[in-house]
Amino acid sequence: MSDARRGASAPHTARRSAPLDGRRVGTVRSTTVARETGGRARPHDEGRGVAKVGKDPWIRPLRGTADVRARVVFFPHAGGAASFYAPFARRFPDGYDVAAVQYPGRQERWEEPFVTTVEGLADRLLPSLRRWASEPVPLVLVGHSMGASVAFESTLRLGHDRLTAHCRLVVSGRAAPSVTREAQEFDSDQDLLDHLARLGGTDPAILSSPDLMDLALPAVRNDYRAVTRYQPVPDAVVETPVLCLTGDRDPQVTPEEAAAWKSHTTAGFRLETLPGGHFFLSDHQDTVVRLVAACAEAGDR
């Protein structure tokens, strides 16, 4: 789902929520009813076989390796969860340690209160990311839509700590921080659901189920409001290479808005345009993984 510039007006949201790429069933366990699994429900056990370093609620391991040559951390879109990136993790070559951020208020963190700002998410994530950024292996932060903003803010914070020597940033489906756009407004939940349906990326079975949407909408509303409140510094720059991925039919990002990311790095910049709309990456998983891996292994900064 997209992160719209304006959240739907709604009363105070409940803490219990499930992402649009997964549903809560009875207990704290969840099952994935994701587009990438063909709509089949299964337990969210994507981290099996992964060598975990402690129990960090912010980072869900998706693929581990004994001999790490690079690490990748995915940052989900608004309303999304770590499980969305499990199919991507399986496509990386040997030697890649792959994980995804798990925002509070969804899946195994459903009892935790939401974080209501993009900046707050980056602040809370920083201790977890510091550990990996301090190690002498490439670390690629990959964010899609709202996740691109969280990844960018996280990279800025790592830079303040002088921990970006081995970092790379991949932003996807998101206009550059220097771009100003008119806020999108949704007067009702139905308007928001219609918007999500147009963008794709959400299983139609979930969108058409009132019960599932009751679980998913609190996270969606929270994240959309976070994006609406986000006020990036227009001239902020990171000292890491930036790869920008965009869909050639993405209604949320124009080619010029994607290319504007070039002004937000003092290192290398590359723009890759792929066929598709806002969720183009779901249809090009192998290509996205190849581009991210190439970014990790590039020697130049």
Each model region followed by its residue ranges:
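Domain-scale detector for complete catalytic domains at protein termini or as standalone homologs
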Residues: 36, 44-142, 146-301
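Compositionally biased, low-complexity flexible segments
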Residues: 1-48
